[in-house]
Regions:
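Conserved acyl-CoA
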Residues: 103-125, 147
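Conserved N-terminal entry element of GNAT/NAT acetyltransferase domains
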Residues: 1-16, 176-181
Length: 181
């Protein structure tokens, strides 16, 4: 990559760019994309109202990932009393398979350890939810030190994040904040 990645906190003005990025990465077939859910979920992955609500939540922080002055990714953190949920994680398809996702995940893990843990010392784990049929993503997160907890939840139809085409569940994965894998 000729230009380095830049990280900043998301702003309301970024919402439409995020909608385009997230829905294209998750709901359209793209060359080189391994995040596309086009064969398992139909409908929009996110909308403006959902993003605005997330950005207004004091317990949520969304990071913008920029490369050459273009938004190429995002990742969200939801802070609970003892854990940090990672979600809204998206890399533009053209930037996938170049180590960008690894750098973004590294960034938020370091951010939590270095910036948030001193303020919130009770934080113990990172947690994320992965679609049960996304075996390649589950394997990727396992290589990054996340482990399935055995907790499986129903696909959140009421969250308005798309309609499953196949039977789906969410698999909870956790990693100790102390682990630096």
């Amino acid at each position: 990559m000729k230009h380095s990645l830049k990280f900043r906190t998301a702003q309301i003005l970024d919402i439409q760019k995020f909608i385009n990025l997230i829905n294209s990465a998750y709901r359209q077939q793209q060359e080189n994309s391994w995040t596309s859910e086009i064969e398992i979920v139909t409908g929009a992955r996110i909308n403006a109202e959902q993003l605005a609500q997330m950005l207004a939540d004091d317990h949520f922080k969304l990071f913008v990932v920029e490369h050459a002055e273009e938004i190429v990714g995002c990742i969200g953190l939801t802070f609970n009393p003892i854990q940090v949920e990672i979600g809204t994680f998206c890399i533009a398809p053209k930037m996938q398979n170049h180590g960008v996702g690894k750098k973004v995940l590294d960034f938020v893990e370091h951010y939590v350890r270095d910036q948030m843990l001193p303020i919130h010392p009770n934080l113990t784990h990172f947690v994320m939810w992965v679609l049960s049929v996304r075996h390649e993503l589950i394997a990727y997160y396992e290589r990054r030190g996340y482990q399935s907890t055995g907790h499986i939840d129903d696909y959140p139809l009421s969250a308005n994040v798309g309609i499953p085409i196949v039977g789906l569940h969410l698999v909870e994965m956790k990693k100790s904040i102390a682990d630096r894998i």
